[in-house]
Structure formats: C-alpha cells, structure tokens
C-alpha cells in the first residue's frame, strides 16, 4: 500500500482553526489540540446562547410593556392587556408593542383605549 502524504491538507485545516482561534488567549490560541477543544466549546455556546437571546429579548419586551401599562393604570397587568389584545384581534406582537412603548407612549395608550372599546369596560380600568 502506498503512503499518502497529507501535510498540505492538514496544514490547511490547522490554519483554518488557528484563524478561528486568533482572538483566544494563551494556549487556547496556540496549541492545535486546545484550539479544537475551544472551537467546539465556542460553537456550542454560540448555539445555546442564540436560543437564550430569544428568551431574554421576549422577557425584556414583556417588562417594558408591563411597566408602561401599570404606570398610567390603563390595565391592571400585562397578562390582561395581552388577553384583551388578542380578543380584539389586533395583530401586534410584543416586539412592536415594546418599540411603541419606548418611542411613542401616546400611541400605546390609543391602542389600549381601542382594546377597551372593543372588549368592554369590565376587563380594564381607566384612570
């Protein structure tokens, strides 16, 4: 059986790994075996944190909406507001509502008043 020399292929693979790990510190940026381990760990963390980021942003949007709703006393709480939002068939998601809450509060109050008109006064409290 003939010998297969793969120096250039292995070097190309290691160079690619070294360029990925160029911002790592100490041995994690220099040693090939440590680089491969850190590369696996970094890609795993990136995949996990992409899912966590979605959860964190949703939590942030809910907090912003809830704070603004309770501030003026438009509704008692966030869950009642969202429930009445879906009952009145207004198709606004949490991200858009949070952006409206930050940029234009009066617009969110107008949305809340529309919900109150459609659903009724028994579910909301107006101050």
From Swiss-Prot:
One of its GO terms (biological process) is translation. Keywords: Chloroplast, Plastid, Ribonucleoprotein, Ribosomal protein, RNA-binding, rRNA-binding. Binds directly to 23S ribosomal RNA and is necessary for the in vitro assembly process of the 50S ribosomal subunit. It is not involved in the protein synthesizing functions of that subunit. InterPro entries: Ribosomal_bL20, RIBOSOMAL_L20_CS, Ribosomal_protein_bL20_C. It is found in: Plastid, Chloroplast. NCBIfam families: rplT_bact (TIGR01032). HAMAP family: Ribosomal_bL20 (MF_00382). Belongs to the bacterial ribosomal protein bL20 family. GO terms for molecular function: rRNA binding; structural constituent of ribosome. Pfam families: Ribosomal_L20. This is Large ribosomal subunit protein bL20c. GO terms for cellular component: chloroplast; ribonucleoprotein complex; ribosome. Gene3D superfamilies: 6.10.160.10, Ribosomal protein L20. SUPFAM superfamilies: Ribosomal protein L20 (SSF74731). Its main location: plastid.
């Amino acid at each position: 059986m003939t010998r297969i020399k793969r120096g250039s292929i292995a070097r190309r693979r290691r160079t690619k790994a070294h360029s990925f790990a160029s911002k790592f510190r100490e041995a994690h940026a220099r040693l090939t075996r440590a680089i491969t381990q850190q590369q696996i760990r970094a890609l795993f963390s990136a995949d996990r944190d992409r899912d966590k980021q979605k959860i964190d942003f949703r939590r942030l949007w809910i907090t912003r909406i809830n704070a603004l709703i309770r501030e003026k006393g438009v509704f008692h709480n966030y869950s009642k507001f969202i429930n009445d939002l879906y009952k009145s068939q207004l198709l606004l998601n949490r991200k858009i509502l949070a952006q409206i809450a930050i940029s234009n509060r009066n617009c969110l109050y107008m949305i809340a008043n529309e919900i109150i008109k459609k659903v009724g006064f028994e579910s909301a409290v107006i101050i």
